[in-house]
Amino acid sequence: MGDSGSRRSTLVSRLPIFRRSINRRHDSLPSSPSSSNTVGVHSSSPSSTNSSSGSTGKRRSIFRTPSISFHHKKGSEPKQEPTNQNLSISNGAQPGHSNMQKLSLEEHIKTRGRHSVGFSSSRNKKITRSLTEDFEREKEHSTNKNVFINCLSSGKSEGDDSGFTEDQTRRSVKQSTRKLLPKSFSSHYKFSKPVLQSQSISLVQQSEFSLEVTQYQEREPVLVRASPSCSVDVTERAGSSLQSPLLSADLTTAQTPSEFLALTEDSVSEMDAFSKSGSMASHCDNFGHNDSTSQMSLNSAAVTKTTTELTGTVPCAIMSPGKYRLEGQCSTESNSLPETSAANQKEVLLQIAELPATSVSHSESNLPADSEREENIGLQNGETMLGTNSPRKLGFYEQHKAIAEHVKGIHPISDSKIIPTSGDHHIFNKTSHGYEANPAKVLASSLSPFREGRFIERRLRSSSEGTAGSSRMILKPKDGNIEEVNSLRKQRAGSSSSKMNSLDVLNNLGSCELDEDDLMLDLEFLEEQSLHPSVCREDSYHSVVSCAAVVLTPMEPMIEMKKREEPEFPEPSKQNLSLKLTKDVDQEARCSHISRMPNSPSADWPLQGVEENGGIDSLPFRLMLQDCTAVKTLLLKMKRVLQESADMSPASSTTSLPVSPLTEEPVPFKDIMKDECSMLKLQLKEKDELISQLQEELGKVRHLQKAFASRVDKSTQTELLCYDGLNLKRLETVQGGREATYRNRIVSQNLSTRDRKAIHTPTEDRFRYSAADQTSPYKNKTCQLPSLCLSNFLKDKELAEVIKHSRGTYETLTSDVTQNLRATVGQSSLKPTAKTEGLSTFLEKPKDQVATARQHSTFTGRFGQPPRGPISLHMYSRKNVFLHHNLHSTELQTLGQQDG
């Protein structure tokens, strides 16, 4: 009964209300650790104040939807207080103190809720949906309120949680964790001290809190760290329950408070798990202290009261877990169980899910405590799981003992992961029995696995979410999927496969409802596991299957499973655990699954929601989508290919352009482009040929034009040339000597021009060359010279306009043509020179005349010919040429007159 009660409290803590309260605790948890340092006063102290009946509403507002647990308690908190009074005389006798502890617990929750800010919003939605319904159902039961009040009264555990959060924040420094645990203990202890004050008012509350406080106090010196750890573990269970959406937190054994704290408490529970696993002695002490505290509370108080106290103690860390633990214990031990059976059982299952982790350490340190609890009928559900007295604890306990031990042997890390995954019952039974059987071994196994899981989650947290991510990491192994982890533990225990999924659990357990719940948790857990690769990846594949199964399986089947699970577990604890686990799993699945996604506001949750619902859930769907997309693409490609093959014509391809416009347009375009390219190439070839022809023609024309240009530029040149020929003829006939002198002069000019032909401009050179060329033939054939000159002149005149039009082009080609013409002219001028031996004789004989001619040619070069420098073109102005020709013509005229 106590087992179910503590489990209920854990379940309550797992409820989205508590999760949101954990979020708020996380928000306030930074102050909560400081509050933990302030032994008596936590940030949760105000929360404790809110814990009063009126404070339940404050809790609701504080925790928002996570307050659903508080909502329920708000509505049923008056009942809860009476039930608390019934369950725990201290709580009932002194509801003020119960409220006070509740306030402290609530304050812890608030602080955790603050810390769990990220989770708060996500949990709000979660709580709003399935958990709200469950909490409303529980609200109907005053027992739940009383249990919750007891849970709140057990603010010590919650204080422990918040202290544990502080401790967990320090748990990076494990020694700091121990210190923080005492601080949180002292805060819890002071909360307990109010309980002790109320103990003076009520022995039951006293016994509960005095036992808790005494145990905490007693163990606080020795197990101060341990008892906070224990409280935190219980609280972590409760918080794990609270953070059921954070299945990972539930998966982490020691992370119930972190679940409750969502983010900060996640760190706390992670730290707690680490401190437990890091300092197994302290971990065992914590659990032992918690168990002993629970047992002491159980022993000191009535079983119900003790259960309430234990629930309160463990739930103190988590209001809802405490409440449900108390409620579960009370319901198990009193009539509130039926009322709270739905929520309490779910809470118990959540507690179990959370307690499995706690139970792992709890049972380790609580082997004697478990014996006490067994004697006490496992007053705390989580502890009852540790204590095998409860029927379900015994039933699953032995099964899960072997499973837990088996899991420990096979998957020590999986133990912490798998045990939560295998199922709440399995986890608790496994953890409780296996850990009870082998406290040190199981403790090491659970601690090291939880450590590893938490570390894995830490890594994920640090990588994806920072501290919040770490909390989420822890929450996921611990809180988020405690049920899922329980189912996974069941699966793994059954199949010894760490990858066993809720489907495997269904196959192994043969309980579709329970397994479907586990499937839901598996789905969530896998989603959360997406944040924890090592923890989640094992089940991610199966979670995909379970995701599909869950998607196919409505939420109702999970409720049906819960209902079926209730008969499956005839014993009240088992029924409560199964029912509430299923319920909580369903709510958890719906709340954490549905509200997780909607409640992404928290840094953790958005990632979780995305990763959970969008990551692992969507992983197979993404793969399927990719495959479908690839197939679609291939089909489209095939269709295009077929269409193209069928429609080879560009028109048909254009018609099929809508299907594949790019593929089909290129066909005609390519053809057109090819045609255009070929056309252009042909045009280029033609143009090149034309250009070459034109260049050749230009070369020819240029040769003529240069003489003609000279003549056109110098109107006297053509006449001069003809006149020169005629004059030379007359000179030769009349005065051979004078003519010879003139010819010699011309030849000398030609020679001098030939010597510097590279410098001469083509026009003048040509004129000189043509004059020279025609001078030498004139000696042999004088009559040909006028006709040649005339023909050349006519040719030049005919080409004059063409030359004028193409003068620009000729200018561009002038250099090349000039070189060619110079070469040809040089050859032609050499021929006349070779032929004119007479000229050479003249040159040889009248050297003085040659010198004179050269001087004249020099003069002529100065005036008529361009200078040799690069400024020849500048110097070769019409003025100079005209002057030169005038002088030359004047000289010839003088000679002619002399001849005449």
UniProtKB/Swiss-Prot annotation:
Entries under InterPro entries matching the protein: CCSER
Domain of life of the organism encoding this protein: Eukaryota
Keyword Cell membrane among UniProt keywords: no
Protein name: Serine-rich coiled-coil domain-containing protein 1
Keyword terms, alphabetized: Coiled coil
Stretches the record annotates as Disordered: 1-100, 156-178
Disulfide bond positions: none
Family of the protein in this entry: Belongs to the CCSER family.
Biased composition range(s): Polar residues: 81-100
Coiled-coil residues: 673-707
